[in-house]
Amino acid sequence: MLIQRGGLKVVAGLGISGVSAVNFLHEQGYQVAVTDSRPTPPGHDQIPAGVKTSFGQLDQELLLQAEEIILSPGLAPQLPEIQAAIAKGISVVGDIQLLRRATDVPIVAITGSNAKSTVTTLIGLMAKDAGKKVAVGGNLGRPALDLLKDQPELLVLELSSFQLETTSHLNAEVAVVLNMSEDHLDRHGNMLGYHQAKHRIFQGAKKVVFNRDDALSRPLVPDTTPMQSFGLNAPDLNQYGVLRDADGTLWLARGLQRLIKSSDLYIQGMHNVANALACLALGEAIGLPMESMLETLKRFKGLEHRCEYVKTVRDVRYYNDSKGTNVGATLAAIDGLGAAIEVKKGKVALILGGQGKGQDFSPLRSSIEKYAKVVVLIGEDAPVIEQAIQGATKILHAATLKEAVELCQRETQAEDVVLLSPACASFDMFKSYNDRGQQFVACVNSLV
């Protein structure tokens, strides 16, 4: 029989992190209850016996009995039921706060509007390859509290603005906001609210990494906090950046020291150069050897369906960016790959289309004009996209993804890149963006 400790802990909102919090608190011997507005929330069957449940609405009465409320990231603190509890002086936290209380293992904390998952995965691999017992998760993969079961010596956490809203004094070993662009404004009210939520990651941080190309990523921290920057320009002493040789060769660099050519990476594009530099700075902050980090970087092929290198066929590289389901993501992929191959006069053959979700596709125009030799359109919104980009470059149509890949092969030559980055949802032709990406990989593998 577990000893009951302290007052009642009420978990509001189930889902992956809610279930994780309930189980963690129950194992710690706390009196736990859980409430969710859904009648049968996901994970309701994974709640241990002895935990009181109240489903179908957020149980105001139960929340007001709590000593502390653990809020799932999907629920906004602004909800009236939560505000009523706050007005009564009841503490409201999230699973990341519980994690910080439960362990003093060093944390590498990562947030940003884009690239969080790539950087979190890569720095996790760098730490593992350097011999660290590391656990990786948070907003990506495994919920944060579950990571403690591994008894790690280092935690690498991807954190969303929703998770950071209910976290204070994370006291990370090193923290970074990779970049900031408009996102989740429906939840945070405006850009300032979003910015404030993201920057909670720096509270109590021992070291800080920031993106000097993005002023909004730079924190207000005490002058005594060690800070290191990364950016896509020539770096100052001890900072990370890029150096260019006279022949156009691009190097990732620390100060004046050239570390690795961008062409030696599987992950291509300037956005990925920035991600790699961020990882090197984070790795340095936790004492990972440079040699080992560069080895990991050379082998890293990126995340599945996110500008993922597939293979080279007849000196043409193929990339799967099926996760590019909106115009912003596809722009980053075109600009990133286009700028990287421009040095060798390479061009992009782009596969676009699917369900457009009412988006405006005209922002793609100038990048397509600059970097694409051909666009092959697929899916139900092909006519809408064609209208938006008409005249920017050569446009072809394909009835299937297989036909699109074959057309791209016909249109390309050595040093070119074929990129699937549809800027659309996939449900007109595929089960999901995963399915679309897997079919693309299969089509590429069948080329000769």
UniProtKB/Swiss-Prot annotation:
Q: Which GO terms fall under molecular function for this chain's record?
A: ATP binding; UDP-N-acetylmuramoylalanine-D-glutamate ligase activity
Q: Does the keyword Nucleotide-binding apply?
A: yes
- For this protein, what reaction is catalysed? UDP-N-acetyl-alpha-D-muramoyl-L-alanine + D-glutamate + ATP = UDP-N-acetyl-alpha-D-muramoyl-L-alanyl-D-glutamate + ADP + phosphate + H(+)
Could you tell me which pathway this protein works in? Cell wall biogenesis; peptidoglycan biosynthesis
What subcellular compartments does it reside in?
Cytoplasm
Q: Name the enzyme group at the top EC level.
A: ligase
**Entry EC no(s):** 6.3.2.9
Superkingdom to which the source organism belongs: Bacteria
Detail which positions bind ATP: G112, S113, N114, A115, K116, S117, T118
Q: Which InterPro entries match?
A: Mur-like_cat_sf (IPR036565), Mur_ligase_C (IPR004101), Mur_ligase_C_dom_sf (IPR036615), Mur_ligase_cen (IPR013221), MurD (IPR005762)
Question: Alphabetically, which GO biological process terms does the record hold?
Answer: cell division; cell wall organization; peptidoglycan biosynthetic process; regulation of cell shape
Q: Give the HAMAP family listed for this entry.
A: MurD (MF_00639)
Family to which the UniProt record says this protein belongs: Belongs to the MurCDEF family.
**Mind telling me what this protein is named?**
UDP-N-acetylmuramoylalanine--D-glutamate ligase
Q: Report the source organism.
A: Acinetobacter baumannii (strain ACICU)
Q: Which gene encodes it?
A: murD
